[in-house]
Amino acid sequence: IGSNYIQYMFKKYDNEIRIINVDKLTYAGNLENLKDIEDRENYTFVKADICDADAINKIFEENEIDRVVHFAAESHVDRSIKNPDVFVKTNVLGTLVMLNAAKAAWELPDGTFKEGKKFLHVSTDEVYGSLEEEGEYFYETTPYDPHSPYSASKASSDMLVKSYMDTYKFPANITNCSNNYGPYQFPEKLIPLIINNALQGKSLPVYGDGKNVRDWLYVEDHAKGIDMVQEKGRLFETYNIGGHNEKQNIQIIHIILDTLQEMLPEGDPRKELVSEKLITYVEDRKGHDRRYAIAPDKIKEEVGWYPETMFEDGIRLTIKWFFENEEWMKNVTSGDYQKYYEDMYQDK
């Protein structure tokens, strides 16, 4: 999401802004995501861990930071089940480091904060738990009920940001988004995983009965929403950003397969590989939430944002991007990714 946000911001504001991109470059980080902007004079990349207070404080000391958009997080639920420690460290302690660094840089002697400063914490709808009935939606007032180590770590980080807003009047907002998809998404996530496997004739793993429902948000729509909250959102408020594109996981797979068949040219050998026969049902994920769905009423009413990309259109754009960036996919699915994939799905 961070890569797409940076691309969006430069496309919209060009030379009116300067962006400092801080990334630890874990397994899912890839500098190639931003290679077309790396030579811009108003773009700086800093390799750093958000848990490293000295490194983060140094960035604030050496630069006049007006806004922070805090994307950095461990975000894959399956990984959190196998290794929750990493999620607590990055998502909770890392957020604390970011809050403390921004507070130290922005706070005035009288306890107020410099004009125009804002911290935006990017979070997830998974903190709200699971919905059972159609017609029910997550609102900003929905009580938190996380069910996985990932969602618990994000809920904890949200609470930290809320505590800083309440205790110090720290200038911040929180956004909770639904499932993102689009260019540059690491193929541990459902949509790029299915696209990549289908094109290679590999099995398409589906948890449980495949009827878990997610609300899908095209990543550029999300980037626009974050920018609009930064520009127009009321301080200390939470905004839900959702796509109004609810689909069962098995529906997603069928849509991807149909779209691949439609978009692959005649004579392309991959066309014969793409088949529903690849669908493989595997043991359900532990604590698997049944349904997520966001009500984006507040962000629409207060800042004028709404999702512009229908799911079928977004999938076509996503597949087109993967067709045009096959080398990127080859690079990110080599080495460590193969071991991860085997650990996640081989024995299920």
Predicted regions and their residues:
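C-terminal substrate-binding subdomain of Rossmann-fold SDR/epimerase-dehydratase oxidoreductases
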Residues: N4-Y8, K12, A48-C51, I174, ...
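A glycine/serine/threonine-rich, flexible loop-to-helix segment
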Residues: I37, E134, P187-I195
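N-terminal Rossmann-like NAD(P)+-binding domain of SDR-like oxidoreductases, especially those catalyzing
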Residues: I1-N180, Q230, T259, R290, ...
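Residues at alpha-helix caps and immediate loop-helix transition turns in enzyme cores, especially N-
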Residues: N30-N33, N83, F186-L190, I252, ...
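Short, conserved catalytic or interaction motifs in soluble domains
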Residues: Y27, P183, G243
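Residue-level recognition of oxygen-bearing side chains
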Residues: A55, V86, L93, F186-L190, ...
